[in-house]
Amino acid sequence: MSKKTIEYAKKLVSQMTIDEKISQMLYESPAIERLGIPEYNWWNEALHGVARAGVATVFPQAIGLAATFDTDLIEKIGDVVSTEGRGKFNEFSKKGDHGIYKGLTFWAPNVNIFRDPRWGRGHETYGEDPYLTGKLGCAYIRGLQGDDPDHLKSAACAKHFAVHSGPEAIRHEFDAKASKHDMYDTYLYAFKRCVKDAKVEAVMGAYNRVNGEPACGSRTLLKDILRDEFGFEGHVVSDCWAILDFHEHHHVTDTVEESAAMAVNNGCDLNCGSAFLHLKDAYDKGLVSDEAITAAVERLMEVRIRLGMMKDYPSPYEDISYEVVECKEHVELSVEAARRSLVLLKNKDNFLPLDRKNVKTIAVIGPNANSRDALIGNYYGTSSRYITPLEGLQQYLGEDTRVLYAEGCHLYKDKVQGLAEEKDRFKEALIMAEQSDVVVMCLGLDATIEGEEGDAGNEYASGDKLGLMLPGLQEELLEAVAAVGKPVILVLSAGSAIDLSWAEEHVDAIIDSWYPGARGGKAVAEAIFGEYSPSGKLPVTFYQGTENLPEFTDYSMAHRTYRYTNENVLYPFGYGLHYGETNYDGLSVDKAESDVNEPVEVFVNVTNDSRYTVNEIVQLYIRHVDAAEYEPGYQLKGIEVVKLEPYETKKVKLTISPRDFQEVVYPSFLLSAATSLLRITSSPVTPDCMVPQAVSCISVSYTHLR
């Protein structure tokens, strides 16, 4: 940020009265016409496309994007989202529309850690691994904000700082207790990277308390860690109405004035909600100083200046027009992202891909076969066209193949029609299966039953999941259809891990499509018939039930995620198949011993031994040999996505930065010396292996020079 921007912000704020300053700290900020400051609504969403503001390109949900492991793709998507946001903002502003969701401060990405598969909002995240989350979060932020240090294309926001991942039902009163080790090893890592590597403009505080302090008013989180330790220079915004929780649910204050003052005094600059309507009263009572308020407003003015909202400080992006919204190129990128996000979990005897010449009749069965909700997740925009799996198969196969359809059952209820008897669509599904050559079962969830408290419709769990089984009658429907004896392909639509133990044993192929975006059905159909090879990898662990998981409210990382669990799992983190095989050899490093401040370069030859072009995700894992017992086992520390043509070999280089060798031994982050094992893998050889199966293994020693 330039000195000019900082001085301009100070000049603007110095001319404001105390009431005017406070007015700018509310998410609905009024105009100050005498200073040339237009009205502005800070609340805008862009989790996987511009959301809630009309037509936009709807990309796969964040968890699906995470399955690509591809930072270049995610940054490109962020840039497209920002371009569409700019196009909308520019035209809305010309027409005097400054309403909610029409601005440029996007409250995304969500870089919380998906530590427990029951969390309803996990599909908003990039999965369970801090390294992957940090990499992808930074990529999306760079795409949204652009590369001009003094002119923001849009402003990103890393949320929810910092220890936040359910339960949804008690988020307004819950105290998440986390050890210093888990804080720095897991919960803070991605936020730190977003601040230091991507220069994220905003950070949103969470609803819950963290070790006794409400996150939106925590001196430890917002001042000691975020600003002093991480060097954050942007603004902090509260989650919506979270500051009221201070006195209403957390009981750390007695009045709304005390709550507003606590938030500002500890580093919260902007209030999504109503608490700061009482900030003047808090000021009059001496609970908060003019200096604290001024500092907050200066930070808010800095971002508005950098976004080009002041007439004396124009934006280089102000000529982007509405024509870019959902244009052909953007739609094509969304479909490509859907293709890249699909994870092939099972392919018995290379059953897939199908040969369309051999399929005369195909049955598409299940509550998600023709569901738009199963395409889009939450925090979505409006697409001008949706393509469900049913529609994708119909369009792909044309008139030459008959496509039969049956809903089979409701997503979670025992009947589809209210006056009917239970299982009212079962028999139709069985008839369709009997008449087909192959069956595509489209099962899973959607954001009406896994999502955010207050948004998701499952009032029994406030958006969270009670277990990992398919809901309602879906499992029973799957078993009944499979019993017909026709080949079955299961296409899963969900934003989280599902226990597919029965399906793993009994169906021919399984594809996880996540929530693949508005036109994701096109990608599903193309994958089934071999137009491309699926290449996605799981960004989460698929467990066999929840019986061996810790309590949902337990924020210790012990026995959680691939980094700390010792349990047998159904599909491990990083797992995903191709059509055909890729093989690795020639693993080497540029040095067997290195100074702690030096990067290490790792090389491996990767060969595509198939007739399909593949986007191979090369994964590098590190394990510290002499690590403390509370340290993770193997953990992801390197990713390289390489496109390989049929039968092509490429030499791939992965660079491990010095910090990737660090262990968290609070308050230090370095051991004086250690030996680390490096493993490079495409995917575990078998779904039930706990650590990605290494092609080969190398030890690397490094020394910490004091």
What are these regions (language model features)?
Residues 672-689, 694-701:
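Low-acidity, Ser/Thr- and Arg-rich intrinsically disordered low-complexity segments
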Residues 1-663, 667-669, 675-678:
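Glycoside hydrolase catalytic-domain context in secreted enzymes
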Residues 703-706:
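Conserved small/polar residues in nucleotide/adenosyl-binding loops
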